[in-house]
Structures are given as structure tokens and as C-alpha cells.
Swiss-Prot record:
Binding positions for thiamine diphosphate per the UniProt entry: E47
Physiological role: Catalyzes the first step in the biosynthesis of branched-chain amino acids.
Protein name per the record: Acetolactate synthase isozyme 2 large subunit
Miscellaneous: E.coli contains genes for 3 AHAS isozymes: ilvBN, ilvGM and ilvIH. In strain K12 only the Val-inhibitable ilvBN and ilvIH are expressed; ilvGM has a frameshift that disturbs the ilvG reading frame. IlvG (this protein) is Val-resistant and is expressed in K12 strains having what used to be referred to as ilv0 mutations. The ilv02096 mutation (shown here, an insertion of 2 bp, PubMed:7015336) causes a frameshift which restores the open reading frame, permitting the expression of this isozyme. The inactive N-terminal pseudogene fragment is found here (AC P0DP89).
GO annotation terms (biological process): branched-chain amino acid biosynthetic process; isoleucine biosynthetic process; L-valine biosynthetic process
Thiamine pyrophosphate binding, as annotated region: 377-457
Class in the EC hierarchy, top level: transferase
Gene: ilvG
Pathway: Amino-acid biosynthesis; L-isoleucine biosynthesis; L-isoleucine from 2-oxobutanoate: step 1/4; Amino-acid biosynthesis; L-valine biosynthesis; L-valine from pyruvate: step 1/4
Keyword Cytoplasm belongs to the record: no
Length: 548
């Protein structure tokens, strides 16, 4: 067995049945092994698309996603996807070819120090330096990617090592991830919770990554505590939970932001006090003591000092804190905040109102539908107006905010869950970033649906130029967009273009009931903004609702 064949053998041993990639010279031996190696390979049209498809696959399944690329430009094209996976704590293993070992450091054709490049955007990176260490490195790569706080790992394999043959022994390893249960700290936290008059649960993406959604929901059922979610935490709390206040932060609900500003105890669960959540940090939850629960000790006290820091598995910590609470007045106050600041969908004129369209999509989509988004105004509207059922059913780039993420992530999700509906919500700016992945959709006849909100603008940047840069609209106009339906048709994808709100419901039904891939091109008002908004440098109490 040569090194390339061992790579494929190691993938099978890890339970990997699908990988995403793009071949090239330095990775050709691995592709030769994939030819009849028992692992399905999905050919993407760009290595960045392969990395983001691997993220979508990982998010939709909870498994480790795998992407493969050649040396040089193939490897560098993975970098944005790896950075995205790192910031959102997604388990991904990237396998790259490298020039043969004797040529490393000689500026050989398509040689790039991808190990050095990737150090800042991976949890760990390996350069395989001998055939004998390949089994260990492949095993450790998967252990590191999915243990503790998950993240991306890169394995760079010189071509001569891929071709070398030898008797390789399986390597069995597990990363030591035992965390001592913090008994004393848990007891202190229980006492704080029992005394609190206005407790609030702040739920982040770590809950879904820890597969702790059932534990969280049991905790809420027992405590009846008001709760809010970050962008990546959406779906962890059931949308119909009576005391769920919606998303927190810059484009969060007024109810969530106001309640957090009032609370006297904030329990952060798998969350990291990101700047898009907190607004002006020293004014965030000013009256609250903080209990911070997370698997990653590096997040403790990084941005907000915790009165009690609980490091460990959320599946153990949440039940340990669970207790009935007497907080009727606070519960009713939060429910009243939610009712007072609920979304309003009345909108004058015939133009399509994007928030209402997404609400109508939410009402129609199947229960197990996976929604992916790109980045921009449409992303925030999707976060606000779609009822999210589980974290794995809402896949978005929250930490890095990567335009072009939505379509390849939808590809990965659809491959992972072929029997579920997958809808990609995109904007005309983001869509063009990785539009080539329509070729992947066509090649595999993936039945994913695309809702393309087209305002002929880079909408979020334009909104900020309008609000904070004196309406100096610099390079945010996209009036030269292609004919999106004709573009989709060139890839054999059917679609429809709508411009009026009375067309929306029928168009959504047609899209969702279509058998194959479908593009719904939606023209919206170029000046429609995302509200509410916490301005830069402001407190979450100072939300803008409209232009003054």
C-alpha cells in the first residue's frame, strides 16, 4: 500500500464516505487512490467552494468535513474556508498535496509554504515528513478536529510520500480531553441562580457543536428562564418557547437586547461575547453577574469577566445547574417585551418586502429544511424572520462573515442530507462570489433551492454608507448584474423572476415543490435596510429603528 492509498484507507477508517475537492499535480496519487477507493468524491469548481462545502457537510451532520486540494494555488484557495471554519469552530480536515520532499524550499513549481500560511487559520497543521508517520498524522488530524472546541486541521503531504510504498500499521489515538468537573464552581453558580431576580440565558454556537441542544431544552423546561441566541446559536432554543426573545446583538431583537441590559444574572452557554453581540462592551449587561459555561478555557474572561467560569461539557454542566426558579414577574416582563417589539410585516406598495418574503418562506418550508445563507442584509433578514428549529438547520458564516459561503455550503448540506430540502438564501453581491458552484449543482443534479434577493447593491455596505458615511456610495452599485435566470439556465437549472409581492406565495410554492435545483430571483428595493441596528460604538440600549 502506498501513501496515497493509506490516506483513502484512513478516511474510510474514520467513517468518511464523502469528500470535496479539486485535483492537481501534487495530489494526483491521492486522486488515483480515490478512483476505486470506496470514498465518494464531489468535484467542486473552485477549492474555496470545496472547503465551504465541507463546512456545510459538517454543520448539517455533526461529522468532520473533508476537503482536498493540490499544492500552490490549490492549497491557498482553501485558506478562506479554513479561516471560516476556525472562527465558527467547525471540524474540517483539509488534505493538500505538496511538492516532493527534496524540492521543498526550492521555489519549485506550485510550491507554497501552506503549513506556514495555515497556522493562523487552523486548529493545527501537519507536514508529513515520512511515510511511517502518515498513519499517526491522519489519525491525530481527525482527533484534533473534533475534540474539545472543534476546528479545522490541515495535512500537507509531499507527492513522493504519497507514492512511496511500505507496510504501514494502523494508528489508534485519542486526544486527551478529560476536564475535571468543577463541583465547587457549580455549587456557587447554583446559589447565584437561586438568588437571581432577573436571570437571562445567552446561548451561543457551542451548544450545537457540543450536541447539547436536548440538555439546553431540558434546562429551559425546568427553569423557564428567558433566553436569547447569537447568530450561530439560532435553533438551539425552540422558536415557540414562551420566553424566547430572539437573536441578540447588532441586528438582534429589541426585546432580547433590552432584556439583557436589564438582567441581574447572565448565563453564557457556549458563547464568546463577540463584538457583534455586545455592542459597546463596557455597557453590555451592566447590572449582571456572569456565569460563563464553555469547553474552551481560552474564552473564559477574555472579553467579559465571569463571576463563575465553568469549563467543561455542556451536557454535564447544564443538568447540574438545572433547578426550578421563582421569577414570574421577570418572565411576564420578558414576554411583554417580546409582544411589544414583535416584527411588523405591513409594507406599502407593490414591491417585495424581503422580511415578509422570508417569513412566508419560513411558514412553508418543511420541518427538517436546511437553510444556508451568504453574508449581508439577506443573512440578517434570514436570521430575524425564519423560525429556526435546530442549529444544524441554519448554516451561515457568522464569525468570518464570508461572502460566497451560502451556495457551496448548501452543496455540502444537500450531499449530506439528500432527502431533506436545502434552501440557499443569497444576495446579488454574494452570489457572484462562488457562482461557479452552479456547475457542481448541475453535475450532481442536487435539488437545492436558491432564493436570490437582488437589490443591485452591496446592500449592507450601502446601508452603512447611507447611515455613517454621509450617503457617499462608493463602489456599492451592481446595476451591471447578469441575467440571473439566463445564467441558471446555462447550467440547466430552472427558475423564475418575481418583482411584486403578490407573486411571492405562488413562487415559493413552485420552488419548494420543484423536483430539481431551482433559482428564485427576487427583485427588492435598493434602499431597504436591516432594522433594528446598534450603531458602531453604541450600547445595545441605543438601537436605531429607522432613519431619523
Amino acid at each position: 500500500m502506498n501513501g496515497a492509498q493509506w490516506v483513502v484507507h484512513a478516511l474510510r477508517a474514520q467513517g468518511v464516505n464523502t469528500v470535496f475537492g479539486y485535483p492537481g499535480g501534487a495530489i494526483m496519487p491521492v486522486y488515483d487512490a480515490l478512483y476505486d477507493g470506496g470514498v465518494e468524491h464531489l468535484l467542486c469548481r473552485h477549492e474555496q467552494g470545496a472547503a465551504m462545502a465541507a463546512i456545510g457537510y459538517a454543520r448539517a451532520t455533526g461529522k468532520t468535513g473533508v476537503c482536498i486540494a493540490t499544492s500552490g494555488p490549490g492549497a491557498t484557495n482553501l485558506i478562506t474556508g479554513l479561516a471560516d471554519a476556525l472562527l465558527d469552530s467547525i471540524p474540517v480536515v483539509a488534505i493538500t498535496g505538496q511538492v516532493s520532499a527534496p524540492f521543498i524550499g526550492t521555489d519549485a513549481f506550485q510550491e507554497v509554504d501552506v503549513l506556514g500560511l495555515s497556522l493562523a487559520c487552523t486548529k493545527h497543521s501537519f507536514l508529513v515528513q515520512s511515510l511511517e508517520e502518515l498513519p499517526r498524522i491522519m489519525a491525530e488530524a481527525f482527533d484534533v478536529a473534533c475534540s474539545g472546541r472543534p476546528g479545522p486541521v490541515l495535512v500537507d503531504i509531499p507527492k513522493d510520500i504519497q507514492l512511496a510504498s511500505g507496510d504501514l500499521e494502523p494508528w489508534f489515538t485519542t486526544v486527551e480531553n478529560e476536564v475535571t468537573f468543577p463541583h465547587a464552581e457549580v455549587e456557587q453558580a447554583r446559589q447565584m441562580l437561586a438568588k437571581a431576580q432577573k436571570p437571562m440565558l445567552y446561548v451561543g454556537g457551542g451548544v450545537g457543536m457540543a450536541q447539547a441542544v436536548p440538555a439546553l431544552r431540558e434546562f429551559l423546561a425546568a427553569t423557564k428562564m428567558p433566553a436569547t441566541c447569537t447568530l450561530k446559536g439560532l435553533g438551539a432554543v425552540e422558536a415557540d418557547y414562551p420566553y424566547y426573545l430572539g437573536m441578540l446583538g447588532m441586528h438582534g431583537t429589541k426585546a432580547a437586547n433590552f432584556a439583557v441590559q436589564e438582567c441581574d444574572l447572565l448565563i453564557a452557554v457556549g458563547a464568546r461575547f463577540d463584538d457583534r453581540v455586545t455592542g459597546k462592551l463596557n455597557t453590555f449587561a451592566p447590572h449582571a453577574s456572569v456565569i460563563h459555561m464553555d469547553i474552551d478555557p481560552a474564552e473564559m474572561n477574555k472579553l467579559r469577566q465571569a463571576h463563575v467560569a465553568l469549563q467543561g461539557d455542556l451536557n454535564a454542566l447544564l443538568p447540574a445547574l438545572q433547578q426550578p426558579l421563582n421569577q414570574y414577574d421577570w418572565q411576564q416582563h420578558c414576554a411583554q417585551l417580546r409582544d411589544e417589539h414583535s416584527w411588523r410585516y405591513d409594507h406599502p406598495g407593490d414591491a417585495i418586502y424581503a422580511p415578509l418574503l422570508l417569513k412566508q418562506l419560513s411558514d412553508r418550508k418543511p420541518a427538517d429544511c436546511v437553510v444556508t445563507t451568504d453574508v449581508g442584509q439577506h443573512q440578517m433578514w434570514a436570521a430575524q424572520h425564519i423560525a429556526h428549529t435546530r442549529p444544524e438547520n441554519f448554516i451561515t458564516s457568522s464569525g468570518l462573515g464570508t461572502m460566497g459561503f451560502g451556495l457551496p455550503a448548501a452543496v455540502g448540506a444537500q450531499v449530506a442530507r439528500p432527502n431533506d430540502t436545502v434552501v440557499c438564501i443569497s444576495g446579488d453581491g454574494s452570489f457572484m462570489m462562488n457562482v461557479q458552484e452552479l456547475g457542481t449543482v448541475k453535475r450532481k443534479q442536487l435539488p437545492l433551492k436558491i432564493v436570490l434577493l437582488d437589490n443591485q447593491r452591496l446592500g449592507m455596505v450601502r446601508q452603512w454608507q447611507q447611515l455613517f458615511f454621509q450617503e457617499r456610495y462608493s463602489e456599492t452599485t451592481l446595476t451591471d448584474n447578469p441575467d440571473f435566470l439566463m445564467l441558471a439556465s446555462a447550467f440547466g437549472i430552472h427558475g423564475q423572476h418575481i418583482t411584486r409581492k403578490d407573486q411571492v406565495e405562488a413562487a415559493l410554492d413552485t420552488m419548494l415543490n420543484s423536483d430539481g435545483p431551482y433559482l428564485l430571483h427576487v427583485s427588492i428595493d435598493e434602499l431597504e435596510n436591516v432594522w433594528p441596528l446598534v450603531p458602531p460604538g453604541a450600547s445595545n440600549s441605543e438601537m436605531l429603528e429607522k432613519l431619523s
